[in-house]
Amino acid sequence: ENEDPFYYDYETVRNGGLIFAALAFIVGLVIILSKRFRCGAKKKHRQIPEDGL
């Protein structure tokens, strides 16, 4: 029935694209949040030595 080489099952293509987009979004959030928490945990207040003023 589907002898045309340019026939696409658009429902499958759409579902695959939505899954890919959702995974890319989640991975991006994880990367952003991990960088934010890592940088926030390591950030220390720099103490200025009193004799240096």
UniProtKB/Swiss-Prot annotation:
PROSITE patterns: FXYD
Self-association state and partner proteins as the record states: Regulatory subunit of the sodium/potassium-transporting ATPase which is composed of a catalytic alpha subunit, an auxiliary non-catalytic beta subunit and an additional regulatory subunit.
One biological process term in Gene Ontology: potassium ion transport
Name recorded for this polypeptide: Sodium/potassium-transporting ATPase subunit gamma
Known role: May be involved in forming the receptor site for cardiac glycoside binding or may modulate the transport function of the sodium ATPase.
GO annotation, cellular component aspect: membrane
Location of this chain's protein in the cell: Membrane
Xref: Pfam families: ATP1G1_PLM_MAT8 (PF02038)
Gene3D superfamilies named among the record's database cross-references: Single helix bin
Keyword Kinase: no
Lineage start: Eukaryota, Metazoa, Chordata, Craniata, Vertebrata
